Amino acid sequence: MRILYGVQGTGNGHLSRARVMAKALMEQDIKVDFLFSGRKPDQYFDMQCFGDYRVQTGMTFATHSGRLNLPQTVRQNLSLSLMKDIQALDLSCYDLVLNDFEPISAWAARRQGVPSIGISHQAALIHPVPKMGNTWLNELLLMYFAPVDVALGCHWHHFGFPILPPFVEVVPCSSEHTHQILVYLPFEDVDTIASFLAPFSDYLFLVYHSQQPQVQTAKHIQWYGFNRDGFKQHLASCGGVIGNAGFELASEALTLGKKLLVKPLIGQFEQLSNVAALQLLAAADSMMTLDINVLKRWLKAASPNPIAYPQVGDTLVKWLRGGDWHHSQPLCQELWAQVALPDTWR
């Protein structure tokens, strides 16, 4: 079996899931080529596990000050290059296309009649799971942005549907620094973040961001450019996580038993829906703006117990090899049977 794996590059969560799958596919001797789209080639990092991967433009989302900028998103994606890339992608040597919300490989597979399986958090939102900010446009986006023959979604809870657990790979840590807080708010302005954290000098905030403040900030706020290994180590040892409401970081925090405070990207349906799910499960605190009062209460909160999600990638690859791709319920049941969910989630 030879597979093309298309991955949406706009979010690090897609890349994290692809890393888990790359390892599982390699261990089971399946030939796989990776195609990434959605960000510039020089903005990918720690990509060694993907071998000789390809990068194409694809589609991406524009943001400003913690909000989705829909007009700018439309403007920057109005291009004939996407259609040309879809038409130019030759899939004749592949038996299957795996897809994590990546439009070029998805539409090329549909045009050429190659079987395709979607593995993404977005695919879980096709089911009536908790949602917020949903519109007919969002429903169209879920169905047609990266259409596939079989859609396998992943979520923190199955909610009674054939959904996979999260794909999580975390660094274990023997010691926890309860007064160290990991902060990852990539869509927020750095000066706004600094002002938000400034009053809480009893804590050490480890802030990962692509930019640095123009003026020196307080000593209890440390700034880091994104480094995957350093981020994983800080995530493992911190006492809590403040982030946007992306799926993967929240999954890692839940797996490690870290208290979680999320601020969604306003206007982004997936992140708003993640907030709805976290609220229903009582798994995190949330804020729609960087609210100092919410932060003050959250810092005093206790940490939850960790959730031991299974190694989804290994089981999924075995299922892929079996070839019965239109029957995913047994796969999902097998994986969730290994998860001890909190009593309050049941």
Predicted regions span which residues?
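Short amphipathic alpha-helix
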Residues: 14-26
